[in-house]
Amino acid sequence: AQLEKVRSYLFEHGIIVFPEQYLSPKDHIKLAEFFGEIEVNRFFTPVASHPMIAEVRTTPKQTQVIGGTWHTDHSYDVAPAMCSILSAQQLPPFGGDTHFASMSAAYYAMSSGLQDMLRKLRAWHSDGSFVNSSNMGINPSEMPFVTPLFIR
């Protein structure tokens, strides 16, 4: 019953945040499986003891924050994941904030004329700017595709 409330809240609001909560790897996987089949992010190393979890880690030499610009997770996949489940294990002494915006709320706040115009648009999706995919045996030129601007 509690998980159904979580699902309902996610569909209603587009995001759920549980601040200062520890989520064990086992519980992380259990929660993810509740929403459907787990799609492990191919750009990050799976956790050895829990290969259904991808570890997003910044190295000490890294100057750019991973996903540091506005983005939608996995929009470059032909069938994007329904949601992402993140659990911060280490936080920097400052920063590290994640901000969220609802494209659905923005769309429904627009005039019907602007909505009609946007419905006709298509978007080009690619993972090429996200990571140097060639190091992973993935050819970015094979991945871009055009989709309606609104997926869901």
Please identify what each model-predicted range represents.
Residues 1-152:
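Non-heme Fe(II) oxygenase catalytic core, chiefly the N-lobe of the double-stranded beta-helix
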